């Protein structure tokens, strides 16, 4: 592998600009070689002066890069030292509190189940758990910094070696010895000491001396590009997707030849439509995950996932394919129910019952950690006013806004099984056209409108909670106003529908109000998508016209196509209203809704790419590469002390004027000496060397 590719694959994305600009140096060297005057047409002194002038410029650029790397490394190392001292203080405090309350100094002797502990013991248990997670994330940050150190040194060695080869000189090697090999970022070995001390602390204080268990907890995933999925996972993805395609073809043929024309298929479509949208969403989320990894958008950090254990795009494809097969089989079983002893209405219950069981399955199988993370996230979303709202919380609530049809179809299914289904008929899900009452899919009894507002309500109260926590009216209250327009839009749609059915004279009043609020909502959300969520139309965009100063994805066309797509699908409702209000075709509203619901899921899929890109660039601006695990809250005294430390002569000053350093943990100058500190072991992370000159 060429070193440029190796460097690109192994850098920490949030620190990209702080690495050696290897490709820029290569371009400088090759340009100088191509533009050099030929010895055949000019004298030798002119050629020497040309290369001497180039070398002066080249080494000046090297000095700037070296200064940048030294400064950044020193800043991150100082941050790591402060963080380590804080974690040691918190650990010592937890151990002291544990000793006072239980009379036991080690964690080994605390074997009571969590639900048998007192409130104080529960708090201590939670603190220890948080400390384990905090040390794990801290260790990851140390490995990233060590990787930064090794990659930059290798980069300087490679580019200076290439310099000497092209210019046929040894001045590059001399410059490396005189400058790089004595640079603080290379000579400083404190990072290795911190790694060893962290391993020792976790082993002796948190894992009862079990080094194997400690290293399993601290294990860092391979740095670099996404690792290939296990062969069996890849096999299952291909198998499931192939079966799903074949079953879909079978479904189309069965629908053509098996369905009876005197039967209404809409109850069946409404019941199975939500399942299809969920499968589509999972599949597109897999594509999102793949795209983020390829572009270097660190979605693992953004969603605060465990970097050591999380679902890849292959796993999401596998789940989507498996559920897709079950969905097709269930629908096929409904078509062929007349020749079986099982009534039609059993199959949807079996399908969705299995999906629910798959999600809440308490055994540690079938991606237990990921399912548990999703359940916790769903709980936080539906109890939004009582928790601080993180990125993953409002991201999931935004997804629910695009999946509102699933909630409405779930409400329809419950209503249909409760009020409309004829349990004594084997074809209960395919009633006669004359017998379809049509109560459940209308706004008549009010529940449907409430269900339609639930996703917008969740985001609305999340915005209010964020305003309460930050006291910032913009953007949180303004964003809440965006979601509040949905309430008016749904209300007037419901009033228009019910008044139209009853033939009231004021029907058109509600129709016009519905249209007005639909326009307001669409314009509001479109502007917010493009400007706030995606960060586009930045006045400092420079050559990236109508975009932003920095973009992650390689082609500008992606952004322009996404803008056009968002505009079209945000106003697709105009087509729906035009058709339903002018045509006499029965079930025209259901037909349009069935067509546009998957398109809305697709719109959210595109939105996800650019929303996470914008969040990733925010993390890059703050050089945030690991999760901030809060062990103890930061109070006013701690904040003052932190600012004093930042202003000390031996401290590292913030180089970004518009940014203030914030830590979620208490800061203390006291650094207690734990027993584990005398047992530190050296740990090294090997960076693949690519010494062959052909590979540079």
Swiss-Prot record:
It is found in: Cell membrane. Changing residue 211 to E: Increases phosphate efflux. The keyword Phosphoprotein applies. Inorganic ion transporter that mediates phosphate ion export across plasma membrane. Plays a major role in phosphate homeostasis, preventing intracellular phosphate accumulation and possible calcium phosphate precipitation, ultimately preserving calcium signaling. Binds inositol hexakisphosphate (Ins6P) and similar inositol polyphosphates, such as 5-diphospho-inositol pentakisphosphate (5-InsP7), which are important intracellular signaling molecules involved in regulation of phosphate flux. Widely expressed. Detected in spleen, lymph node, thymus, leukocytes, bone marrow, heart, kidney, pancreas and skeletal muscle. One of its GO terms (molecular function) is inositol hexakisphosphate binding. It is linked to Basal ganglia calcification, idiopathic, 6: A form of basal ganglia calcification, an autosomal dominant condition characterized by symmetric calcification in the basal ganglia and other brain regions. Affected individuals can either be asymptomatic or show a wide spectrum of neuropsychiatric symptoms, including parkinsonism, dystonia, tremor, ataxia, dementia, psychosis, seizures, and chronic headache. Serum levels of calcium, phosphate, alkaline phosphatase and parathyroid hormone are normal. Belongs to the SYG1 (TC 2.A.94) family. It comes from Homo sapiens. Residues 366-383 dip into the membrane without crossing it. Changing residue 533 to A: Decreases phosphate efflux. It catalyses: phosphate(in) = phosphate(out). The gene is XPR1. GO terms for biological process: cellular response to phosphate starvation; intracellular phosphate ion homeostasis; phosphate ion transmembrane transport; phosphate ion transport; response to virus. Changing residue 398 to A: Decreases phosphate efflux. Changing residue 459 to C: In IBGC6; phosphate efflux is decreased; present at the plasma membrane. This is Solute carrier family 53 member 1. Residues 439-643 form the EXS domain.
């Amino acid at each position: 592998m060429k070193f440029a590719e190796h460097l690109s694959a192994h850098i920490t994305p949030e620190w990209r600009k702080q690495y050696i600009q290897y490709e820029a140096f290569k371009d400088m060297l090759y340009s100088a070689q191509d533009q050099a005057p030929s010895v055949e047409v000019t004298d030798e002194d002119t050629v020497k002066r040309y290369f001497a002038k180039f070398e002066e410029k080249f080494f000046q650029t090297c000095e700037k890069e070296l200064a940048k790397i030294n400064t950044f490394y020193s800043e991150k190392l100082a941050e790591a030292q402060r963080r380590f001292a804080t974690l040691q203080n918190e650990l010592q405090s937890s151990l002291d509190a544990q000793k006072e309350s239980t009379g036991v100094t080690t964690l080994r002797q605390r074997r009571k189940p969590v639900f048998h502990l007192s409130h104080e013991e529960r708090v201590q248990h939670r603190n220890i758990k948080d400390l384990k997670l905090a040390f794990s994330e801290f260790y990851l940050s140390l490995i990233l910094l060590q990787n930064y150190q090794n990659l930059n040194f290798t980069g300087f060695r490679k580019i200076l070696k290439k310099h000497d080869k092209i210019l046929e000189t040894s001045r590059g090697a001399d410059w490396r010895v005189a400058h790089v090999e004595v640079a603080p970022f290379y000579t400083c070995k404190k990072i290795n000491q911190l790694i060893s001390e962290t391993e020792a602390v976790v082993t002796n204080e948190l894992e009862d001396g079990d080094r194997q268990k400690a290293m399993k907890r601290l294990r860092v995933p391979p740095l670099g590009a996404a690792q290939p999925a296990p062969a069996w996972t890849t096999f299952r993805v291909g198998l499931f997707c192939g079966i799903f395609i074949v079953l879909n073809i079978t479904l189309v043929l069965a629908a053509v030849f098996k369905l009876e024309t005197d039967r209404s298929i809409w109850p069946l479509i409404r019941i199975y439509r939500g399942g299809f949208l969920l499968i589509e969403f999972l599949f597109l989320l897999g594509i999102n995950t793949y795209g983020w990894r390829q572009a270097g958008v660190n979605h693992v950090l953004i969603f605060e996932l465990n970097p050591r254990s999380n679902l890849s795009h292959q796993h999401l494809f596998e789940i989507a394919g498996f559920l897709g097969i079950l969905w097709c089989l269930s629908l096929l079983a409904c078509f062929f129910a007349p020749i079986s002893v099982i009534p039609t209405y059993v199959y949807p219950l079996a399908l969705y019952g299995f999906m629910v069981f798959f999600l809440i399955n308490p055994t540690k199988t079938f991606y237990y950690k990921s399912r548990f993370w999703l359940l916790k996230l769903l709980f936080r979303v539906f109890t939004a006013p009582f928790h601080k709202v993180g990125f993953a919380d409002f991201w999931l609530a935004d997804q629910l806004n695009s999946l509102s049809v699933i909630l409405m179809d779930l409400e329809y299914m419950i209503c249909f099984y409760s009020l409309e289904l004829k349990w004594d008929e084997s074809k209960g899900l395919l009633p006669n056209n004359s017998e379809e009452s049509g109560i459940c899919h209308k706004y008549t009894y009010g529940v449907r409108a409430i269900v339609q507002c639930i996703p917008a309500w969740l985001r609305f109260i999340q915005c209010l909670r964020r305003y309460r926590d930050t006291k910032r009216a913009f953007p949180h209250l303004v964003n809440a106003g965006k979601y509040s327009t949905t309430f008016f839009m749904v209300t007037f749609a419901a009033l228009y529908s019910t008044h139209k059915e009853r033939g009231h004279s004021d029907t058109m009043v509600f129709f016009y109000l519905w249209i007005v609020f639909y326009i307001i909502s669409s314009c509001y959300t479109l502007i917010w998508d493009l400007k706030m969520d995606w960060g586009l139309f930045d006045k400092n965009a420079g050559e990236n016209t109508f975009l932003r100063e920095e973009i992650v994805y390689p082609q500008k066309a992606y952004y322009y196509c996404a803008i056009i797509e968002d505009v079209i699908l945000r106003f697709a409702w105009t087509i729906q209203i035009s058709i339903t209000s002018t045509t006499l075709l029965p079930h025209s509203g259901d037909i349009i809704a069935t067509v546009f619901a998957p398109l809305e899921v697709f719109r959210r899929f595109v939105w996800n790419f650019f929303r996470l890109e914008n969040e990733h660039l925010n993390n890059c601006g703050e050089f945030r590469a690991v999760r901030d695990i809060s062990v103890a809250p930061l109070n006013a005294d701690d904040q003052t002390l932190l600012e004093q430390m930042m202003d000390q002569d031996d401290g590292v000053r913030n180089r970004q004027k518009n940014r203030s350093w914030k830590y979620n943990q208490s800061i203390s100058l006291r650094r207690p000496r734990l027993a584990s500190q005398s047992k530190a072991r050296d740990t090294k992370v090997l960076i693949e060397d690519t010494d062959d000159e052909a590979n540079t």
